[in-house]
Every structure is written in structure tokens, then in C-alpha cells.
Amino acid sequence: MSFVPSKVFFTKGVGRHKEYLSSFELALRDAKIEKCNLVTVSSIFPPKCERVSVEEGVKMLTPGQITFAVMARNSTNEYNRLIAASIGVAIPADDTQYGYLSEHHPFGEDAEQSGEYAEDLAATMLATTLGIEFDPNKDWDEREGIYKMSGKIINSYNITQSAEGENGMWTTVISCAVLLP
């Protein structure tokens, strides 16, 4: 049996609780995907896959459903510890080709830093498969321009959740690309 997703939605959440597992559950609830049995998968954006809104995607879910997702996840119980979870996305101009999703889950990076890093990872992985020449030592903004000017990468973006740890609590952040039939 072959399953190639035709739709994807992106979601994120944060949860806080005195128990680690409960903080993860609350992050899933915040992301609106707590009712699924999530199976994490690696980082390929399927060809011809359509992005739908969170609201539309959640309507396609059934409680208990086995649901495939690319997930970035991070947790802390340290007061004021900055955490983030980011999914980077890079989509080729040719929709018959696959793109890339990347996961990044750092400590000490805010949402902008973490998101840009994840987006850079995904775009760089895609660029290398498409034969786009670039200098990996250039900063992301310069490489992003090169990637998009090549005409081979049409879009890149990220979805990121960040938070700071609270005293006496576990804090969990997640960002997910949820893959649908």
C-alpha cells in the first residue's frame, strides 16, 4: 500500500504543566492535534501536496486516527530557559518534484532566529538536490535570494513556536507539518 499525502497543514503549540508528559499534551491541544495518534516521519514535502489551513486540516482528522507528521519538539523545566521548535519548508517551482521540511529545536534562540535557521536548512537541502550553486558561507538572506532567483525554488517559509520556562513547571513547544491523504 502506498500513501503519498495530498494535503498538509502547519500548526504549533505551547503547553505548561508540573508534569513533563502533561505539558506535551497541552502543547498538542494548543496545536489542535491532541486527538490523533501521531507518527513522526522524516522531512519530505510530497509532490503536488496542497497546503490547507489549520481549521480545514483539523476537520479532516478523526479521533484515534493514525496521523503522520513532521514534528519539532522541545521542553524545559528551567526557569527563564528560552526554547523553540521550528519547521522549515522549501517548495520547488516544479510541483511534480518533492520539497523539504526541516525540524529545528534549539535552546537560547527566539522564534525569529529558530525559524530562519529551519527555513535555511530546508531550502539548502532542496537547493543541493536541484543543483543550485551557492556559497554555504554566505548568510541566509543572500542565499535565499540566490535560491529564489534560480527559478527552481518557488517558496520557503517556517512555522515556529517559542517560549520561556516558568518556575516549577515543564514548558513544551511543538511545531508540526501534519500530512493528510
Swiss-Prot record:
Gene3D superfamilies from the UniProt entry: 3.30.60.30, Pyruvoyl-Dependent Histidine Decarboxylase, subunit B (3.50.20.10)
InterPro entries: Pyr-dep_his/arg-deCO2ase, Pyr-dep_his/arg-deCO2ase_sand, Pyruvoyl-dep_arg_deCO2ase
Cofactors required: pyruvate
Pyruvic acid (Ser), modified sites: 43
GO MF annotations, alphabetized: arginine decarboxylase activity
EC top class named in words: lyase
Record Pfam families: PvlArgDC
Alphabetized UniProt keyword annotations: Decarboxylase, Lyase, Pyruvate
GO biological process, one term: arginine catabolic process
Catalytic activity, reaction form: L-arginine + H(+) = agmatine + CO2
Cofactor stoichiometry and binding remark: Binds 1 pyruvoyl group covalently per subunit.
SUPFAM superfamilies with a match to the protein in the record: Pyruvoyl-dependent histidine and arginine decarboxylases
Record-marked site positions (Cleavage (non-hydrolytic)): 42-43
EC assignment: 4.1.1.19
Stated family: Belongs to the PdaD family.
The name this protein goes by in its record: Probable pyruvoyl-dependent arginine decarboxylase
Species in which this protein is naturally found: Chlorobium luteolum (strain DSM 273 / BCRC 81028 / 2530)
Gene behind the chain: pdaD
